[in-house]
Swiss-Prot record:
Family: Belongs to the glycosyl hydrolase 5 (cellulase A) family.
Swiss-Prot/TrEMBL catalytic activity: Random hydrolysis of (1->4)-beta-D-mannosidic linkages in mannans, galactomannans and glucomannans
Organism: Aspergillus clavatus (strain ATCC 1007 / CBS 513.65 / DSM 816 / NCTC 3887 / NRRL 1 / QM 1276 / 107)
Highest taxon of source: Eukaryota
Name listed for the protein in its UniProt record: Mannan endo-1,4-beta-mannosidase F
Region Ser-rich linker: start-end pairs: 79-113
Gene: manF
Catalytic: annotated span: 114-436
Broad class of where this protein is predominantly found: secreted
């Protein structure tokens, strides 16, 4: 789903220090920041644009990268983390597949969850904690939230962003500061404390929070070339490596997701498939313990196809083929009947069952990752929940989207939003969970 509202709240930018703090940037061509790490942290070469302070065997109070490992381009952290900052350090088991179902915390069953794309962009920790309190109390186990926030120019003071793609220099900057990945750090730490599992996508197909066009604006190419442009894919993989390296030991991660609703209109399905296969293999090379999925809408199906637009391959996607990629652990699909030009409950049920058949044939579970109807939260979508719950291989559903009253007012309302504690919350969430 396109995240239609921006939540850009203020937070203090961490001050630069003589040494890079935990997970800070410590080397890179044209890098003018710290080149040593705090005690107990080593400067680790990640790619041609970025070296990062990671936990490791520093033998003295600082560690310096050899000149032979200086990257050939720049990715600098505009504000380094400080020694007072706490990174996620939770313990527990990793979520995994178990046949056609998911296993979380040793339990193999059907799970319910939701989406709250805006959560890492909040700067009030109490607001983040309140969200997780309510998810935990309700019994929602999986939360999908954005792991990206791409910009082409540095925003106003304190505005949260994760990565700068500089149009003038053609270089990328990962923001590990207090208005950057430290916000995602807090979300993951809070998820650990509350026993909630997170799905983290790395890029957006849509322009909200930068998306693929933020890359294109800085490095050239077009939307259909994004998946094959060498410069873009190198920067994209550098970002993946920074994120996965930062959180790969956290049990709060349910799955890494290649992107939100990737499309390549008019392209051969080879384009997205090859990207899926290559990127998922790369993620598994960094982190073999967490699951990986595509983030796609589920378009491009021959099973039970009625010839409608979502079943077609017009957007360059082949659901069954993408699911079959060796390093994809489970399938995901979305459902928005009005946006896609289909309008009844029966079509939605058909869509759910079609994907379940493909997942069952592949021997992998399906996750009904986004669904909803504008301003009608207790109608057809409840029937879709029941269909998902009772169809083999459908093993979890996440409604779009969660809403809550925050210290700054209500969270974004795109008319799909279901606010905690309302009558709609009871019929669409509480009653659904009671049936699992």
């Amino acid at each position: 789903m396109r995240s239609l509202s921006s939540v850009a709240l203020l937070s203090a930018i961490g001050a630069a220090s003589a040494q890079a703090g935990p997970w800070g940037q410590c080397a890179g061509i044209s890098h003018t920041g710290p080149t040593t790490c705090e005690s107990g942290w080593s400067c680790v070469y990640l790619n041609d644009w970025y070296s990062q302070c990671q936990p490791g065997a520093a033998t003295s109070s600082s560690t310096t990268v050899s000149s032979t490992k200086q990257p050939s381009s720049t990715v600098a952290a505009p504000s380094s983390t400080t020694s007072a900052h706490t990174l996620p350090t939770g313990s527990g088991s990793f979520a995994k597949t178990d046949g056609l179902k998911f296993n979380i915390d040793g339990k193999t069953k059907y799970f319910a969850g939701t989406n709250a794309y805006w959560l890492p962009f909040l700067t009030n920790n109490a607001d983040v904690d309140a969200v997780f309190d309510h998810l935990q109390q309700t019994g929602l186990k999986i939360l999908r939230t954005w792991g990206f926030n791409d910009v082409n120019t540095i925003p106003g003071s304190g505005t949260v962003y994760f990565q700068l793609h500089d149009k003038a220099t053609g270089t990328s900057t990962i923001n590990t500061g207090a208005n950057g990945l430290q916000r995602l750090d807090y979300v993951i730490s809070a998820a650990e404390k509350h026993g909630i599992k997170l799905i983290i996508p790395f890029v957006n197909n849509w322009d909200d929070y930068g998306g693929m066009n933020a890359y294109i604006n800085a490095y050239g190419g077009s939307k259909t070339e994004w998946y094959t442009n060498e410069k873009i894919q190198s920067v994209y993989q550098a970002y993946i490596k920074a994120i996965v390296s930062r959180y790969r030991d956290s049990p709060a991660i349910f799955a890494w997701e290649l992107g939100n609703e990737p499309r390549c209109k008019g392209c051969s399905t080879d384009v997205i498939y090859n990207w899926v296969a290559k990127t998922s293999a790369y993620i598994k090379s960094l982190d073999p313990n967490h699951m990986v999925t595509t983030g796609e809408e589920g378009m491009g199906l021959t099973v039970d196809s009625d010839g409608s637009y979502p079943y077609s391959k017009d957007e360059g996607s082949d659901f069954a083929r993408n699911l079959a990629a060796p390093d994809i652990d489970f399938g995901v699909y979305h459902l928005y009947v009005a946006d896609w030009g289909v309008s009844d409950n029966a079509w939605g049920n058909r869509w759910i069952k079609s994907h379940a058949k493909v997942c069952e044939a592949a021997g992998k579970p399906c996750l009904f990752e986004e669904y909803g109807i504008k301003d009608d939260h207790c109608g057809d979508s409840l029937k879709w929940q029941k269909t998902s719950l009772t169809t083999t291989a459908n093993s979890a559903d996440l409604f779009w989207q969660y809403g809550q009253q925050l210290s700054t007012g209500a969270s974004p309302n795109d008319h799909y939003t279901i606010y905690y504690g309302t009558d709609d919350w009871k019929c669409a969430v509480i009653d659904h969970i009671s049936q699992i």
